[in-house]
Curated annotation (Swiss-Prot):
It is an enzyme of class 6 (ligase). PROSITE patterns: FOLYLPOLYGLU_SYNT_1, FOLYLPOLYGLU_SYNT_2. It comes from the Bacteria. Its cofactor is Mg(2+). It comes from Buchnera aphidicola subsp. Baizongia pistaciae (strain Bp). This is Dihydrofolate synthase/folylpolyglutamate synthase.
Length: 426
């Protein structure tokens, strides 16, 4: 519970500044350090049922679908996701709600107290604080989103009852490897012996399958052990556990994420009601995932930040009936594959605005524009300048697309909330 005396030491913003500026990122890549502190904190053994979700894209969406479905089924649920979009407190939710600053401050103090001289990364520190918060509540279920990779991710210190991999694609190559096989080995490190592992990648590398079977993991692979199919305006799901037909399509999250979450829950043995599922999937919304915030003109925010998500974004954008121009604002982090993020969208974007994000991790606008056509691309100083230029010329028939990272969407949200008064925001 909250130690109010300690909690007054730093504000949440002071804590986050400390974590951003004084925590190390390059520490020996093992879980030994975080295991050691977690054991002292008493957070390794939980009575709650644990889902862990990894993959290149769709982790957050799948986690939020799981949360929504399980909450609506009457369970007490803790959710830990990253990164946050607008507020740090988005990262930890208890029964669907964010917690007040004081709870996070108290958890940070506890981690710091038991850390002593043990080195922790920022993400390891934050993950431990989330587990402390979960321990304070009598939860039925904990849902953890993997931060990066899986095998050596701090979330992997808990032994999950059901592990999920949404998909495998190239991202974070310097850490995870340069091909799907090596990446799949890292991501499947979240699998546990004799436990269920849901795989939503229909071309899951053979090496990861071999290692999983060697570990006696109970693999459940899409299109082999479970299938889902969209037919016009509905879809169906079938596995050895359930067959649900004529399901309504989700409105605001991808069908892939919904089907993956349903597979995970059905294999877990946790009881859910089909009627509840049907009603809740149409209500799920997730900020920054092909989020339409205006219709006059259409303004779309998407956190697509790697080649796989950029290709998916192109597919979604191509579904629009184009009556006007598409204006794109793009800001990308410097460690990303810029060329392969922007390339899929070049055929459909009419005007490009490249920005440098307000973070030291940002690629510069000059670095981004190198991969775009000369005739329709320009550099803007920042998000504000780019959007002001666009809004000077945009019409109600046009589309404004803002994408490239979570930070890009965050900066756009701040501008739109404070400055845009003449557009019909949803």
């Amino acid at each position: 519970m909250i130690n109010k005396k300690l909690a007054r030491s730093f504000s949440l913003y002071e804590w986050l500044y400390y974590l951003d500026h004084f925590m190390l990122d390059n520490i020996d890549p093992t879980l030994n350090r975080v295991f050691y502190v977690a054991k002292k904190l008493g957070v390794l053994k939980s009575k709650a049922f644990v889902f862990i979700v990894g993959g290149t894209n769709g982790k957050g969406s799948t986690c939020h679908v799981l949360e929504n479905l399980l909450l609506n089924s009457g369970y007490r649920v803790g959710l830990y996701t990253s990164p946050h979009l607008m507020r740090y407190t988005e990262r930890v939710r208890i029964n669907g709600f964010e917690l007040e600053h004081l709870y996070h401050i108290s958890a940070f103090n506890d981690v710091k107290y038991f850390q002593n001289d043990v080195l922790l990364t920022r993400f390891e520190f934050i993950t431990l604080s989330a587990l402390i918060l979960f321990k304070s509540y009598n939860l039925d279920i904990i849902i953890l989103e993997v931060g990066l990779g899986g095998r050596l991710d701090a979330t992997n210190i808990l032994s999950a009852d059901v592990s999920v991999i949404t998909n495998i694609d190239i991202d974070h190559s310097k850490i995870l490897g340069v091909n799907r096989s090596s990446i799949s080995v890292e991501k499947s490190g979240i699998f546990r012996k004799n436990k269920i592992a849901i795989v939503a990648d229909n071309n899951f590398p053979k090496v990861a399958q071999y290692l999983a079977k060697k570990k006696k993991v109970r693999l459940r692979i899409v299109n082999i052990d479970w299938i889902y199919k969209k037919i016009e305006f509905e879809w169906s799901f079938c596995s050895s556990k359930i067959t649900w037909l004529h399901l309504p399509l989700p409105r605001n999250v991808s069908l892939d994420s919904v089907a993956t979450a349903l597979s995970a829950v059905s294999e877990s043995g946790i009881k859910i009601n089909q009627k509840v599922f049907r009603s809740c999937i149409s209500e799920i919304t997730l900020c920054g995932r092909f989020e339409t915030i205006s219709y006059n003109p259409i303004i779309i925010l998407d956190v697509a930040h790697n080649p796989h998500s950029a290709r998916y974004l192109f597919k979604k954008m191509s579904s629009f009936k184009k009556n006007g121009n598409i204006f794109a604002v793009v800001g990308i982090l410097k460690e990303k594959n810029i060329k392969d993020i922007v390339s899929p969208l070049i055929p459909i974007v009419d005007y490009w605005y490249c920005i440098t994000l307000l973070t030291h991790r940002s690629a510069t606008s000059s670095e981004i524009i190198k991969y775009l056509p000369n005739h329709n691309s320009q550099i803007s100083k920042n998000m504000t300048v780019a959007l002001e230029k666009i809004f000077d010329k945009v019409t109600n028939n046009d589309i404004v697309l803002i994408f490239g990272s979570f930070i890009t969407v965050c900066e756009a949200n701040k501008f739109l909330a404070n400055k845009v008064k003449n557009f019909k925001l949803l």
